[in-house]
Regions:
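N-terminal periplasmic/intermembrane-space "pro-region" immediately following the signal or transit peptide
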Residues: 3-86
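Structural signature of outer-membrane beta-barrel channels/translocons
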Residues: 121-125, 161-163, 227-232, 260-264, ...
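Detector for outer-membrane/organellar transmembrane beta-barrel domains
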Residues: 250, 255-364, 376-377
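Outer membrane beta-barrel
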Residues: 74-95, 105-245, 251-253, 260-267, ...
């Protein structure tokens, strides 16, 4: 800023004589315009430098989980606040061959928003390699014409980042969930996502109701998280969410942690989550996940294996194993992706598993815009009731799927990043 004042003073001094020729006046105006332009560039570079030195490690979690979509640089204001967002909507034809209400259509066409969002984030350097960080992100629904377009809090936090790592409080994806993101082809809120099976247990539908279905792909509210610095590719994360309604007999707090390693060719993650007293006091729900991926050129192939255990109303524990194979490849502007997930039986109860696969093709028109198409199929065993269609059958309230259903979906949509 001092340099700007000096330059303007020099220009003014030379401009003191009253009778300038027209050409000299024009030259003076050009110089003043150049100074203003240079000053704006200096401000922009200063904010970029501050963002690089003080940006939170949360950038990895903010990244689009669809690894096929081209990256887009978010907009940064002069005050250092970054605006960013994603609009993802598609036209779908979905089918469920078994629904619980005879008046419910087994197939429908619909328009869906898939975790579209808008966010603000920023940081402030506090000196001594310390920075304050914050983020506010909400989910929006451009397909919802009958209600509010704003329908939920996404990853939002406030905290500190420094040489010690990153610590924050707020609402955020658990380390267990984040460990899987490297393989995810879609946002979790989509009929095409692998998280309709991976990370989930089935309810025990084999002649009793001791077990409630559990989902470990969670964005945890009221959470305290710590992320270690990245040490030559290694990073640890830990999250703790207290139980504000704790009683003398039950404490439903949640603990989630992970260790990851990543370089130009490999990605590996080991994650664990524990949820005590969820169904019955003194019985824990817990999950362990192992993820590995190999990166090559424009592609990635990977696998996830997990062991999930849930408490029952009889104060026992039942477990199941899930497996996922996934891959994606970028060829020019085209993006190809596919995955297969197999969920095992719950405990010793037969026919409580399911499998699912999805095929995806996308085309990047620019770094902001992708057009995509996808097909998915989920097949339940005779006593299982997993669903890509949430708790209701293809959007019809009150008409849930029944055991043993097969669900399919075909869609074409567009993603715009800003």
């Amino acid at each position: 800023m001092q340099k700007k004042i000096i330059v303007l003073a020099l220009i003014s001094a030379f401009a003191a004589p009253a009778a300038f020729a027209d050409t000299e006046k024009a030259e003076l105006e050009k110089l003043r315009a150049m100074v203003q332009e240079l000053d704006q560039k200096i401000r922009t570079l200063e904010h970029k430098l501050e963002s690089k030195t003080a940006a939170p490690a949360q950038a990895n979690a903010n990244a689009n989980t669809n690894t096929n979509t081209a990256a887009s640089a978010p907009a940064t204001t002069a005050s250092g606040i970054t605006f960013y967002g994603r609009v993802n909507a598609d036209f779908e034809s979905v089918k469920n061959d078994k629904v619980s209400a005879v008046t419910t259509a087994k197939s429908v066409n619909r328009v869906q928003s898939n975790a579209s969002r808008f966010g603000l984030k920023g940081s402030e350097g506090l000196g001594d390699d310390l920075a304050a960080i914050w983020q506010l992100e909400i989910q929006v629904d451009p397909a919802n014409g009958g209600g509010t377009p704003f329908n939920g809090t996404r990853n939002s936090n406030v905290g500190l980042k420094g040489g010690f790592g990153t610590v924050f409080v707020g609402t955020w994806d658990t380390p267990y969930k984040l460990a899987h993101n490297k393989l995810e082809l879609f946002d979790n809120a989509s009929i095409f996502s692998a998280t309709n099976l991976i990370g989930r247990t089935g309810a025990n539908n084999a002649a009793n109701t001791l077990v409630t279905a559990v989902n470990y792909n969670t964005r945890q509210s009221s959470v305290l998280q710590y992320w270690s610095p990245n040490l030559s590719g290694f990073q640890g994360m830990i999250a703790y969410s207290p139980d504000s309604g704790q009683t003398t007999t039950q404490n439903k707090s949640k603990l989630s942690l992970s260790g990851t390693y990543e370089n130009d060719m490999l990605y590996g993650a080991l994650a664990y989550e524990n949820r005590p007293d969820q169904t019955t006091a003194a019985v824990d729900d817990h999950a362990t996940r192992l993820v590995g991926a190999y990166k090559f050129g424009g592609g990635l192939i990977g696998m996830a294996y997990e062991r999930l255990s849930v408490g029952t109303a009889a104060a026992t524990t039942e477990s199941q194993s899930n497996l996922e194979l996934a891959g994606n490849y970028k060829l020019g502007n085209s993006n190809l992706g596919a995955f297969y997930v197999k969920n095992g039986n719950l405990g010793a109860r037969a026919n409580t598993g399911a499998d699912m696969y999805t095929l995806r093709y996308g085309y990047n028109f620019s770094k902001h815009t992708e057009l995509y198409g996808a097909y998915t199929r989920l097949s339940n065993d005779a006593s299982a009731n997993y669903s890509t269609l949430t708790a209701t059958a293809i959007g019809t309230v009150g008409a849930a799927s029944t055991n043993g259903s097969t669900q399919t979906g075909l869609g074409i949509g567009m993603i715009y990043l800003f």
